[in-house]
Amino acid sequence: GLGDVYKRQLIIVSLFIYFLKGSLKKHAGIYYIGAAVISIAVFLLEFLPMPLFVKNNILGIFAKGSIGTAMFVAVMYTGALPKGSKLIAPLMKIRGELSITAAILVLCHNFTYGITYFKMLFIKPEALSATQLTAAIISLVLIIIMIVLTVTSFQAVRKKMQAKKWKQLQRTAYVFYGLMYVHIMLINIPYARLGLGMYIANVVIYSIVFLGYAAMR
């Protein structure tokens, strides 16, 4: 069921962080390449006939940006939880690497869906509903912010920037999280209003996650 989808994402990301945090810090480049390879493979496989189970359960969690989003949520909460907590210490160390990995995986989602929606946005915007149009525009803003934040998360780039400038730039992450929530809602609410269980659960779960974060900030 749907609860299992979220459990699966959470379990995958939690296990990834728990077992690979040291390795991610030491060999970040390998993980970035791995994430890029997965992204490209998922993108290409989307065009091939696949058993529904594989399409929904394996490719889907990458194509829909779910794993990347779950990683961003981990990064997001790292900044919101109390500094001294045991949970945070290991996460703080890999925050940059985790957000870069998440960004690479989310770009896979942007390409997979972008082929349809961005094409329509630029060629035939009237074919999109008002919510789809807004979601597509927000998506473009999100991609720009994400690329800027990702590039400046690389240590080599970060070292070249003034600490104050870098900190100010990182604050745009709040805009990113806010727009990400709006984007997710715009995609899910129209279907949720039709009474589709999966989309109703999306609205509820993402609202708890994002509004809970806002309350903690």
Where are these regions (language model features)?
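Short, small-residue-biased leader/transition segments that mark boundaries at the very start
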Residues: G1-Y6
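Hydrophobic cores of alpha-helical transmembrane segments in multi-pass inner/ER membrane proteins
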Residues: R8-L15, G68-L81, L140-T152, F176-M180, ...
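Short, hydrophobic transmembrane alpha-helix segments
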Residues: F16-A28, F53-L59
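Short aromatic-rich membrane-water interface segments that cap or initiate transmembrane helices
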Residues: N57-T69, E126-S139
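Hydrophobic alpha-helical transmembrane segments in multi-pass integral membrane proteins
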Residues: L107-I115, F176-Y191
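Extracellular/periplasmic helix-loop-helix junctions in multi-pass membrane proteins
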Residues: M185-V203
